[in-house]
Each structure stands twice: as C-alpha cells, then as structure tokens.
C-alpha cells in the first residue's frame, strides 16, 4: 500500500503531479482589426474567443446576451411579468447580469424582457472586517449598484427585513443582526464550517426577503466556473444529496420562491470581454472572501478548479455539465412551515428541539432527509455506544450479548426511534 499521504504535497495535494498541457490553450485573443467578423462579414473583428471564430463588438454582445436570454426562454420557468428579486454583489459577473437585464428592458416590445426586477444587496461585509473598513466597502458597492437605476433594497445576512438603498441611516442599520451573526459564526472552529454556514444563511436570507417583497423568483449571477466549484465542494462536504439543486438552473426546494441561475452558461472569458466592449462603462468590485487564506475544503477545491480553468478550460465545463445529469429528491414544506424558520435560532443555546417533529426536510439547508437506514450513521452511532457501554471487566458472553443489543439500538436511533434504557444503558 502506498505510504505517501496528502500532507507530503502541502496544501496543493498531488496536483503538482498532473502534467500541464504545453502550450496552454489561449482563452481569447484580440485581433488586429483587419480581419472581418465571421458572423456579419461587415464589421472588423475585435476579439476571438477560445474555439470560436473572430467576432466584431456587436456580434459578440448579441451572442452573450442571447445565451442569457436563451436560458430563460428555453426553460419557461419565469413567467411573463413576474417580480424577480435580483441579487446584487458587485462582482464582475453580477454587474454583467444587471446590465443584460437593463438592456433587455430597453428593447422593443417583441424583444423586451418581460420581468419586473427588484434588486437587493445583502451585505456580508461585516464578516472579518472592522467597522470602518465595512463602511467603505458598503459605500463602494452602493455606488456601483446605483449606476443601474433599479428599485433597490439593502439588508444584511441573517436579517429578516430590508430597507431602500436611499435610506439615510443605511450604514448604521442592522447593528444587532451583525453582532448576532458574528457571535454565532465565531463559535465555529474550522474555516470549512464557517464558509458553509455563510452559504446556507445567505440562501435563507434571500428567501425571507423574496417573501417580504413578494418575488416568486430569485436571480443569482453564478457562472459555470462558480458552479463547478460548488459541485466539487459539495461532494467534499458530504452534500451530495442536494448537489443537483445547488448547481441547477432552477432550485425549486421552495416552490414559492425559486432560485434561478440564468448566467450558468457563461464563462469568465465572456464576462471579461463583455465588460470591455459593453455599451456603457461598467464599474465592479473584486469580492474578497474573509477566509480565503484559511485552510478549508472550499478553498482547496477553488484553487484546484481555478488551476483547471487556466490550463484545461474544457475540463471545467465537463465538471459543471456533469451536474446536469444528476437528479435530486425534493420535499415540500410541512405544516410546520419551516420556511419561516429563523436559521440563526438553530444555533441558540436556549433552543429546545421538538422531539415529536415530523419534518422530512433539513431545517438548515431544506434538503430531503436521508438518515433512514444510513450505514454511515449506523457505524458512527454503534461506535459511540461501544465506547460508552462496554466495560473491560465484562465477560465475553456479556460483551457479545451487549453488542447485539447495541446494534439494534443503533439502528433504532439512526431511524429516529426511541431507544429503551436511555443514553448510557
């Protein structure tokens, strides 16, 4: 058996053993302007995407915007005239999505985008930052948001309310919510747990605000590269049960407020060139993860996928498309109405869980529970019982008899059934 372990390679694992393509494939190139666009054969070409023919500025913008509109039109999930909660973060792909929505709303009746956008900026900038730095980042993002002139609202992660971005007390609001969130977050020991906690709370906050603003759809700006990272991260985190919905075009775990990812077919190269050739100069900000320098499963996965994107861009697309072939069981909310559950309250020390709960969904991520008959949970529970019940002074016959009883108790506990004799019997 090989004695080489992952630690022998440092943080990058065994990635250094992969042979890099030589030379690395060119992602895109700017043409000299003498070659005509292969699409319209009229205007001079200004760029050439990887594995694409040279294009002029107008044909490129039409191509990218068509991919965005085609994702919405092909599925027909978003109904005409629907109120849509568009999530703002200020990143490059997020700004591109907002510009595409603005462009679609300005078109003539036949090509017009038939939605009513409502933009929300859910700030996470208080995580890992001092208050002075937080204020500066929020002000910069609000400035970027105002360039689109949409009706916009502001909130913070973990909050249940939102206010208009024009509010004069915007930067001072939600002090209690920020303090509560940071206090709970500080209770997690690893960066992996903290990053996962932020992701799940972000989704829950968006659903709560969507309900407040009466928006049945939520638009996210995740592109294919982001979803490839999410797919592999979820596998590493053991979230395979919800993996398909976490990267799907439509996440319908909550049928009243569906999460839509209309940018999933775009890649970083198209985003970069869109910003360069857009009709208007677009401002954006590079997002910084407060835990990017910490060792975590998510960070290692992101580093691995970013490396693939630089040297094997087609492989990233293959990883992302693999998720489209997966299916996931969805469970409707029960009468307990866990959609209104305050997610942060699950980590309150004074919380008392209802032992008679009949919920079939996880209250944290709203995925279908799959603990019944789980061999993994059985092994963990059986090991715990052996550690707490077996006494070295017992005879062989007593240990065998106790083991049989513990196997049955472990199965019952995994399936949520009562175990006779209490915890230490």
Curated annotation (Swiss-Prot):
Residues 13-22, 404-416 have a biased composition (Basic and acidic residues). Residues 1-22, 404-425 are annotated as: Disordered. Signal peptide: none annotated. GO terms for molecular function: nucleotidyltransferase activity; sulfurtransferase activity; tRNA binding. Residues 1-11 have a biased composition (Acidic residues). Pfam families: CTU2 (PF10288). GO terms for biological process: protein urmylation; tRNA thio-modification; tRNA wobble position uridine thiolation; tRNA wobble uridine modification. Pathway: tRNA modification; 5-methoxycarbonylmethyl-2-thiouridine-tRNA biosynthesis. It is found in: Cytoplasm. It comes from the Eukaryota. GO terms for cellular component: cytosol. Keywords: Cytoplasm, tRNA processing. Its main location: cytoplasm. Plays a central role in 2-thiolation of mcm(5)S(2)U at tRNA wobble positions of tRNA(Lys), tRNA(Glu) and tRNA(Gln). May act by forming a heterodimer with NCS6/CTU1 that ligates sulfur from thiocarboxylated URM1 onto the uridine of tRNAs at wobble position. PANTHER family: CYTOPLASMIC TRNA 2-THIOLATION PROTEIN 2. Belongs to the CTU2/NCS2 family. This is Cytoplasmic tRNA 2-thiolation protein 2. It comes from Culex quinquefasciatus. The lineage of its organism: Eukaryota, Metazoa, Ecdysozoa, Arthropoda, Hexapoda.
């Amino acid at each position: 058996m090989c004695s080489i372990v992952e630690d022998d390679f440092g943080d990058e694992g065994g990635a250094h053993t992969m042979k890099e393509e030589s030379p690395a494939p060119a992602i895109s190139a700017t043409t000299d302007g003498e070659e005509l666009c292969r699409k319209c054969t009229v205007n001079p070409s200004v760029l050439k995407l990887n594995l694409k023919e040279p294009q002029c500025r107008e044909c490129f913008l039409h191509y990218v915007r068509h991919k965005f509109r085609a994702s919405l039109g092909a599925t027909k999930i978003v109904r005409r005239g629907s109120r849509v909660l568009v999530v703002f973060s200020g990143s490059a792909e997020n700004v591109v999505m907002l510009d595409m929505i603005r462009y679609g709303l300005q078109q003539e009746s036949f090509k017009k985008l038939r939605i009513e956008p409502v933009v929300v900026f859910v700030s996470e900038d208080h995580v890992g930052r001092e208050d002075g730095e937080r204020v500066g980042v929020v002000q910069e993002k609000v400035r970027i948001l105002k360039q689109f002139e949409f009706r916009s609202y502001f909130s913070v992660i973990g909050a249940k309310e939102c206010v208009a971005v024009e509010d004069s007390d915007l930067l001072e609001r939600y002090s209690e919510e920020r303090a509560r969130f940071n206090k709970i977050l500080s209770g997690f020991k690893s960066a992996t747990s903290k990053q996962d906690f932020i992701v799940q709370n972000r989704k829950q906050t968006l659903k709560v605000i969507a309900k407040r603003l009466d928006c049945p759809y939520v638009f996210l700006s995740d592109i294919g590269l982001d979803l490839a990272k999410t797919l592999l991260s979820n596998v590493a985190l053991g979230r395979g049960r919800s993996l398909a919905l976490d990267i799907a075009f439509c996440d319908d775990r909550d049928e009243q407020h569906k999460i839509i990812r209309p940018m999933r077919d775009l890649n970083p190269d198209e985003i970069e060139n869109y910003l360069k050739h857009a009709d208007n100069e677009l401002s954006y900000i590079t997002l910084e993860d407060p835990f990017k320098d910490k060792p975590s499963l998510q960070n290692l996965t992101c580093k691995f996928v970013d490396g693939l994107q630089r040297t094997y861009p087609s492989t990233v697309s293959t990883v992302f498309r693999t998720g489209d072939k997966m299916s996931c069981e969805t469970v409707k909310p029960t009468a307990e109405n866990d959609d209104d559950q305050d997610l942060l309250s699950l980590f309150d020390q004074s919380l008392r869980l209802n032992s008679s709960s009949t919920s079939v969904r996880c209250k944290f991520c709203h995925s279908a529970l799959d603990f019944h008959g789980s061999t993994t949970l059985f092994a963990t529970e059986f090991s715990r019982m052996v550690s707490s019940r077996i006494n070295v002074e017992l005879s062989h016959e007593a240990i065998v008899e106790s083991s049989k009883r513990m196997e049955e108790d472990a199965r019952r506990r995994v399936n949520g059934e009562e175990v006779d004799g209490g915890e230490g019997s």
